[in-house]
């Protein structure tokens, strides 16, 4: 027989007394992480007298909400609350360092209204997670910004196609830092690293804010950015919300890049947020890239955005492929002459080995049982479905039952085989997918890369070959044309 347990009374937990309410501005308006989408309004809380000196605008606090304790962000201190009955008291201050200014909180509110979302969804992207160890050691600076850019305009600067985009955006930043602080928003880590390297060559200090850093470094740099000093801040798309000094310059690098769109709800994009900062922060906004996006092009046509470009000519040769061959016969002489001078870049649209398979006998498309097309990730790999990922180890044509495959829509690995046969004894470097090369040596070789994975080389490439050029325009979306034009001009500056 089981031994009965002793009966224990459940103790009642009473809330601790918070003490008297502050005499000066006794209430705080707070954004609360409710976890409920439609509860998106700020809430008023009483401020205890013992916390009155640390409950400031932009400070993280812990507040009671329902039957639990949640995080909140102080918007402002007020004299009278919106609702007088049933007010609760701020439990404690999580961090004494403000992580938002009145202007950045206004920006968060406008973004939440524009994209119809809970403000905390924007705060989650705008402010890095708190690190207690950094909070304890961070020392706020007593000096504030001394310069302010008097211009508050917005423009698009088209890069020159024969020059590196990273060098050109660095030049714009160094020109703007003389007039006030600068924020550079770049699409991805590779662009951030390249721009940081250019700033270091110019002996220009900067603050970096992106997810590639450790949590400690990212949070420490973010706190330093809130000090509103004359400095260059660079980061990925979330850095667009970093607090800025009045009259700062915001530079959106490659503004047409899809990486500048937030993948989580509410799917804001850095370009539109930067344009909102023009009116909120009196910021000067510079959108830059080789080709404006369709959105910016419409604003340029309507004269709402100024457009600046410079005339430049680059040597371009077009070759028509014959019989679906990868390399036209007339291109070999140009490639051989340029290989002797340095690395030659080949840009291909697809990774893998073959993006499509046909039956070699009846030429019907090889399909998975789910209806998806089969492809080859490497030469000796089994056909895999592009939709469900299932492998077809014993594939046979569903029409003629034969098993001989004919590969179409070549990927970078199959292109490597053909180029290696065309240029024997020439070193070939691959950069795509999970094997991206950041740099290659400036010596005779062939570099095969997919868009977005092009390695840098000191002095640039001796020649750039864009293979299957028309395929870049054949994507089934309206932005295919703008992406293709941006890519062609970008590789020209490589």
What are the residue ranges of the model-derived segments?
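Accessory, non-ATPase domains that flank or precede helicase/AAA+ motor cores in DNA-metabolism machines
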Residues: 1-320, 337-340, 345, 455-458, ...
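Conserved phosphate/pyrophosphate-binding and hydrolysis machinery centered on Walker-type P-loop NTPases
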Residues: 20, 97-101, 162-166, 185-189, ...
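Short, hydrophobic beta-strand segments that form beta-sheet elements in well-ordered domains
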Residues: 184-185, 233-234, 286-288, 347, ...
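Short, charged N-terminal beta->alpha structural module
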Residues: 193-198, 407-434
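Conserved helicase ATPase core of P-loop NTP-dependent helicases/translocases
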Residues: 213-228, 425-450
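C-terminal boundary of histidine-terminating zinc-finger modules
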Residues: 315-332
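Cys/His-rich short segments
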Residues: 340-422
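Conserved RecA-like P-loop NTPase helicase motor core
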Residues: 468-494
